[in-house]
Amino acid sequence: MMEKKLNYGCEGLCAVISGGTSGIGLETARRLLDDGARVYILGRSRERGMQAMHYLHEKTGQNAVYIPCDVTSSEQCTHAINKVAALEGDGFQLDILVNSAGFYREQRLEQLTEADFDAMMAVNVKGTMLLTQAALPYLKSGSAVVNIASDAALSGNYGCTLYCASKGAVVAFTRALALDLAPEVRVNCVCPADVDTPLLAKQLVDADGGYTLADMAAAYPLQRVGRTDEVAHVICSVASPANSFMTGSVVAVDGGITAG
């Protein structure tokens, strides 16, 4: 069955998506391209970036631009945003910024090292803040920032103290920044639960049979994990100019896992 094309009202807008070469970020890029936006995807792997551009063109007939960027580096974040500005030309406004780059690892507190702490916080917290900071000069009236956190920011998960803390920080950052940038710029946060992505596949491999996708699905009221298109739809809706009265909000896309 052919997927029904949705209209988010983003035609002619410019969007930058970190973590845009795979998973939720890539699907968000696809939907925004399909909607007529100009899309720049950021990621560390040039190979994945090239593959993502090919995939997006194949799916939409439109061209996204890949820019290498490690969001844990202030210099690389600034370079990436300045590259977008140079390509866009005079009077550039960044209409949509999606902070989708993320890092996940399950570890109990007694297992954590300082290096583990630094690695998790560097991507999930510092990376979100650094890229947003680099984008600030180009976030103008009507711009929207969408940060990607997790259901783990809203309720505790076993063996995930550090990950929960890092995503909780993203939620707090979202709410504080929404106050700082109002009324010109909207800042919101989307919190997905387990979604069928390469990151989830790696999580199951790392579990080494300790639990399976079926085990994971059984924990959800909807009896399944999410799909990237379901989360990307919410991200695009939150970023849409049609949601112009929405800021400082935290939206769970979690199959009901945080309801109980």
How does the language model describe each region?
Residues 2-6, 155, 236, 247-260:
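Short C-terminal tail/terminal secondary-structure segment
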Residues 14, 21-22, 45:
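Conserved glycine-rich cofactor-binding loop
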Residues 108-109, 113-118, 216:
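Substrate-binding pocket helix/loop in short-chain dehydrogenase/reductase
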Residues 132, 166, 174:
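Active-site helix of classical SDR
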Residues 137, 178-183, 244:
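Alpha-helical segment proximal to the catalytic Tyr-Lys
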Residues 150:
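Residue(s) in the substrate-gating loop at a strand-loop-helix junction
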Residues 189, 211-246, 253-255:
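C-terminal helical subdomain
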